[in-house]
Amino acid sequence: ATNITYRWANRGYVEGTFYNALSYFFGVQKKWNNGHSLSFSTWGNPTERSSQGASTDEVYWLANNYQYNPYWGYQNGRRRNSRVVNDFAPAAIFTWDWNINDKTTLTTSLFGMYSMYKSTKLNYNNADNPQPDYWKNLPSSYYDVWNEQDTRYRTAQAFADWNTAVNWWRNKENRQIQWDRLYYANRQAAANGQDALYYVQAKHNNNTTITLSSSLNTHIGKDKVFNVGLMIGQNLGRHY
């Protein structure tokens, strides 16, 4: 038996998101007249998807959109999301069934799976936070519109800065990640012999699982069944 399906969305409901997923299954079995049979099955679901980020009510008001997503921006005129998840866990199982007699059966299986999970995040080093909804980029960081008693952040200059920040946020390009500017900043840093100021960090969580199991089933009476089994397994994880 074989089955393959594919699902995708170049643009999700939330702007800047996408989804790609393939799933497959393959199974085969061989039976012999002497009571033995062998079967093999394998399956997997490689997936790539981008994420949506939550923000503050101030940001949603500025963007006039409660579906605002701060995780994406334009690079060379194309949308790029900074939070992308790649997930793939291919698995396979090999099974030997032996009908010893009319009352007794032995089933032995070897199972293996290698799961790979990676998630990315935009990070920075000795530079300004590149996230567009970082609190220092918001109008509220210049002027306190709520607390009339706070004279520190209610000066004429603070109000002018607040208006400037509001107008800056009204531009859609400004409220998304500035990928081209980040690359330009890295090129300038490299020209001065410095390390990259901005980079995409990837976190990996990989696991290998191997299991060998065997079970013996026998009828010892009209309404009695005896079962005994053995299972040996190992799991190896890598996180970096």
Residue ranges and their predicted role:
Residues 87-240:
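Face-selective signature of the C-terminal outer-membrane beta-barrel domain
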Residues 9-12, 45, 73, 79, ...:
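Glycine-centered flexibility motif
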Residues 18-23, 54-69, 123-133, 138:
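Flexible, surface-exposed loop regions and adjacent strand-edge segments
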Residues 1-9, 13-52, 90-100:
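Transmembrane beta-barrel wall of Gram-negative outer-membrane proteins
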Residues 2-8, 63-77, 186-197:
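Flexible, solvent-exposed coil segments and beta strand-coil junctions
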Residues 16-20, 75-76, 80-88, 200-208:
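Short sequence motifs at beta-strands and strand-loop junctions characteristic
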